[in-house]
Each structure stands twice: as structure tokens, then as C-alpha cells.
Amino acid sequence: MRYIFLICFLPFFVFGDQLVYPLPKVVYNKQKAALGERLFLDPSLSKDSTVSCADCHSLSRYGVDNKEFSTGIGGAKGGVNSPTVYNAVFNFVQFWDGRAKTLKDQAKGPLLNKVEMGNTEKGVVAAVEKNRYYAVEFKKIYKDGVTFDNIADSIAEFEKTLITYNSKFDRYLMGDKSALTKTEQEGFGLFKGKGCISCHNGVNLGGNMFQKLGVTVEYKDPKSNLGRYDVTKNEEDKYIYKVPSLRNVEMTAPYFHNGLVGSLKDAIVLMGEHQLGVEFTKKELEKIEAFLKTLTGERPPRFVK
């Protein structure tokens, strides 16, 4: 398991540029992805045909619904903030507690979750088989046709296409030093120098390790969500979560697993206190926030409204 509890400031400041990378190209099956897109947008996969994957993960809203908790079938509310599906292919595990190892495993979860889409494997398969388009396409693409596993596979293949390329920061990393303003570059320097990059690194600036919320100052979650503990039942895993990606972070409020922080600036303050043990000055906050906004990339044009 990937845990990091020690923060070593100087090495991250000196070598920080080598810890973050521009988004790479991803190979995917176009036929499966096209089918998966239809399924992702289709509410008939839920028990009462009212909720689609896109209702909680709006593709025009950078893969979230901007709500504290999403609404499932019958108006039920979920227990954690819905993470973005954009760039999820680069996460080392899926969900806040890391219970799904792959996109395919993750795709199965909401379909069967009683609060979210509330269906069964047989129910999902039956809904898909009723649709003539689906029936024909599954026979073309999969030897065994419509199965629950194949449905999840096609949705996962579509999610591989949800990558937000061409952010200002990616252009900067690829050699265009004029892509960031002086303030944004200073914000990146603070991001490295203060230790943010110790957890938010790699191609996704996060999503590649677990971390405790409350490293330097204890964080008491009013929602009593126990994070990784819910999967492992190990006491040491309480309040440990997958570190979220910071890509498109300005667009994905509210923040954290409990959705309790509404502004990006407040999220930076909280992280400084509980994870780094630092209190940022007003100027530092402004610069770090300016840098984080350079991580906003471009959605596929058809999802821009």
C-alpha cells in the first residue's frame, strides 16, 4: 500500500519539477468507448431508470455535480463527495477509500450501490438487453455479448477518454515557460517549498497514494467517515484516504471526501494547518491558488456547454 507520512521539504523544493509530469496519451478501444459513453449517460441502468453515471459525474462540470453529496434513486443522499471522473484513469486506485483497483471495478460500484443506482447485476443486464442498439453493439464487440462484466468494461473504456489536456501547467511542463505568469510560477514554487508536492505529485498531482487527513494537526470529521478503515478494518487506517488529484481543482468544489469546504482558498488553508503544520500568509494563499488554477485543462469539446 502507498502511504506517505513524512514530509521532507528541501528535496521537494529542489527536485519538485521532476515529481510532476504532463498528461500522457492513453490507448483505448474506440468501439468500446463509444458504447460506454452511451451507457454512462443512460439512466435506464439504475433500478428506477432515473439516475445515470453522468448525474453525479457531470461531464460538462468537469466530472462532478458540485454538491456536498450526490442524489441517488428515490432522492437518497450519498455519504461521500463524488470525485471527478476526469483523469481518473491515472489514479492508482478508485474511490476515496481505494476499494476499487481499476476503472472497471469502479464502474460496477455505483450500479449496485443501494443509495446511488440501486440495481442488481441481473437488473443492469436486463435493462441493457432491452435496448436494440446495445444488444447489437455488444454482440459486435464482445464474444459473449451482454454481461455485467462487459458493461463495466465498456464504461471503463469510455472513462479512459476523459482526459483534460492542454492546461497552462502542462504547457509549462512541456517547455513553454511563458505559459505561467510570474505569480503562478511563484505559486508553484510555494507548492513545492511548503511541501504540498509531497502528496500531490505525478501526472495527476495526486491520486497515487493514500494519506491520513490530519498529519500535523488532528482532523475530526463531523460526518464520521472513516476512510480506508471501512475497507481494511485496521485501526491504523482510520481517516486515511486516497489523495485526490488536483487537476481541474478550481472547477470541482466542494472539496474533500465530506464536501464540507466550499472554496479553494479555504481548502488550501485547511491543508496547510492539518497536513503541513503551516499558516500561509495572504500573499502565499493568493499565489498558491493562482498556481492551482493553472491545472484546469480542456474537456472534450462535445461536453463543453
Please report, for each region that a protein language model flagged, where it lies by residue:
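Sec-dependent N-terminal signal peptides
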Residues: Y3-F12
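Periplasmic c-type cytochrome electron-transfer domains
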Residues: F15-K305
